[in-house]
Amino acid sequence: MFFFNKNKEKSNNSKLKILSGYNYRYKDIGKESEKTIIKYADYFNFDYEIDKRSSFERHFYWLKIKMFIENLEKGTHEFYLWLDADTFICRYENILNHVDKKKHIFVHNQFFKSKHKTKISNIDYLTWGPNVGVILVRNTKWSLEFFRNVWNKKKYLNHYWPDNAAFMDELGYKA
């Protein structure tokens, strides 16, 4: 059993709070990612919260959904940015200068290998879809309700990609 230090948290800016977390399975990469998150947060004077609990009520991937709900309910910041434990920040640009601040959610999109097969060997179909490893959320009632709905999609608790599948379902995609 691994034991971690208490959650790391900084509080003095109400514009943006960076959220992240990892458990013992992601400890090595999480520690490295944490360094870049703190450096980025300090550079722009953003708040951050890095949760390192050793157990969670669901698969640990769901932690981001729970942290969004808890932080949106508190309402202390205008935006919340989730960064997975394998995220590294290389460019020190203020993310809030690159988004339309009227929108509710910004999510990283990427190509996924489709389950559908082509007739040509070694050629795969690709599907475009969201990846919830990096999400920027504006603090609105709509955002809070959205993440509550994602949390309540219990049919994805045993899915191989549980949090992302529930998120995609809430957007109307097939997971």
List each model region and its residues:
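A recurrent flexible, glycine/aromatic-enriched loop bordering the glycosyltransferase active site
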Residues: 122-137, 156-159
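Short coil/turn segments at secondary-structure boundaries
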Residues: 31-32, 94-95, 148-149
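A structural signal for short, well-ordered beta-strand segments and their strand-loop junctions
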Residues: 49-50, 81-82, 106-107, 136
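Catalytic core and acceptor-binding pocket of nucleotide-sugar-dependent glycosyltransferases
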Residues: 59-62, 66, 137-175
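The conserved acidic donor/metal-binding loop of glycosyltransferases
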Residues: 84-88
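N-terminal anchoring/stem segment of glycosyltransferases
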Residues: 2-79, 141
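Conserved donor-nucleotide/metal-binding helix-loop-beta segment in metal-dependent transferases, i.e.
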Residues: 89-128
